[in-house]
Amino acid sequence: MRELNRALLARQLLLDRARITPLAAIAQLVALQAQLARPPFVGLWTRLHAFTRAQLHQLLHDRHVVRATFLRGTLHLLTAGDFLALRAALQPMFTAGFRAILKDRAADLDLAQLAAFATTRLPATFEQLRPQLARQFPRHDERALGYAVRMHLPLVQVPTDESWAFPSSAAFDSAESWLARKPGTSGALGDLDALDALDALVRRYLAAFGPATIKDAQRWSGIADLAPAFDALRPELVTFRDDKRRELFDLPGAPRPPAETPAPVRFLPDFDNLILGHDDRRRIVADEHRPGLTTKNLQVKATFLVDGFVAGTWTLVRARHTATLTLAPFAALARPARTALEAEGDALLTFVEPDATSRAVSIPR
């Protein structure tokens, strides 16, 4: 399991802070979960040398990076080129998802007509858009209409000058309008149909999360059946067996460092795909600790790594001029780990709360 852990950390830029551009890092990771606005910034800070907020703000405002519905039907940050090229692979999952949720409420919904009308009302927040949809399509439920638009129409969120680039209720625009290109055409990988996009998505997944099983890739992407895609790519891949004799796929030449490779302490943000990227997550967190990583309302907590594995969770609270980082370790921490976490935690506080006049890292003994 340590070999899989070190391979994952290497590909996730967590063995050493990478000296690459934020755009290159986002491409390497495929997509950063962005249900909340702050986590992608922290996720890049923990992986990159000398990363600043301004760098990601610039990429978003220059339209090189977008925040959009992507993996698992949730908001992610990814490069504009990848969104254009890879989204087609996910559309069948989006369509199946909204039909399963809406059931008879979407039975006679004309999606093409709905999308065409919605496009004329963008950019807008969904709070602004839903009433307009309801007036235009009065026989359908307002929220069902909004959800259908979100799952059927390629949309991106419009960044602002907020600290973390997006307000809690951000406006959406059509990807074609925002990027001046249609998804599926002229992307970073060229013009791809849905099948080509699916093959590309599998390769990119393995580059960022391999070696991995088919079920791992399905859990990460939200796509129900990736076996045909893996079978088509099998001649180009290498395979291994894990401790349960399950078949793992990988790219030839992808980094697989030795198990004894040192791994520094690292802080991961809420919803980080390092935690969500596999069906079997033992390579990053012990099974007995998994229930403690999710809140009652299914929020994935921010975590920290010691020796490459999740060793606890963290919260950050700002009270007036004081910022406090509180760690909740799963077990007692050795002195070297505590010292390293205190130093790394202070750096995290400086990044997240640069104007705080007092900062503290609290680690229970």
Task: List where the protein language model places each region.
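Long, low-complexity intrinsically disordered regions
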Residues: 1-275, 279-281, 286-365
